[in-house]
Amino acid sequence: GKLGKIRTVKSWVYLDWKHELPVQPDAPVPEGVDYDFWLGPAPKHPFNINRFHFNFRWYWDYAGGLMTDWGVHLLDYALYGMNQYVPKSVMSTGGKYAFPEDARETPDTQYAIYEFDNIGLIWESTLGIGKGNYGRAHGVAFIGHNGTLVVDRGGWEVIAESPQGQERMEAVPLIEKGGESGLDLHVKNFLQCMKTRETPNASIEIGGHIARVAQLGNIALRTGHKIFWDGDKGEVVGDEKAAQLTRANYRAPWSLPKL
C-alpha cells in the first residue's frame, strides 16, 4: 500500500487520569455486598476497598492491569490492521516505576514485544502521564517505509517519511472521526444482535482471542521469560512455569464449566 512495507506496529496507552493508589486497611464487607459471590473463583481475601470496584483491575487475582484492561481494545486494532492474529512469541518487562509504594500489584509501566511473520508489535502502557507516542494518550501506529498511519478513538492521520527533505508520500493531516462513539456503536450492535441472533461485530471468539494475546504479555512479564506460543494447539511451548499461568486455578467449590 501507500505506506510501503510495514515493519513495526506500536500500540500504547498513557493514562494520566490514574495516579498513585494509596494503601488502605482491610475493612468490613459493605452492607448489601455478597462478597464471597463477588470473589467467585478468585482466592479468598479480606475485603479491601482497593480490591473492589473500580480498582480490582490492579490485582493479579482478578485482572491484569493496563496490559489487559486497555490491551484488549488497542491490540485488537493492531492485529486487525496487520492482518496477522497469532503471535509466535512475546517478551515483556516493566514494574512499579512511577508509584513504587502504592497499593497496586500490577505494573504502572510495562512494555511487551510480540513477534509475528516479518513484523513486530510493540505495546507500551503507563499511569500518571498522558503524552504518549505522537503526542497521543492512546493509539496504534502502523510504521511503514513511506509513512506512518496513526489511529486512535478520535481519528487518524498519516505522517510522511521525508529523508533529505524528500517526502516519500503525501501526509494526511488529522481527520477526526466524528459521529457516535465507538463504545455506543458497539453497545447498539450487541443489543441488536440479541434481537436478531446475528453475530456481533466483536464476537466472543474475537474477544476471547485478543484477551489471550494480552494475557500472554502479562505471562511473559510475570515469568521473566520469552514466551513461545503454538497457535494451532493454543498452548505455550516448552515452558511449564508459563503454561501454569494459562490454566484455570479456581477456589473450591468453583470449577471451570465443561461444555
Q: What are these regions, as identified by a protein language model?
A:
Residues 2-205, 211-259:
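Contiguous beta-strand/loop segments that form the cofactor/metal-binding neighborhood of enzyme cores
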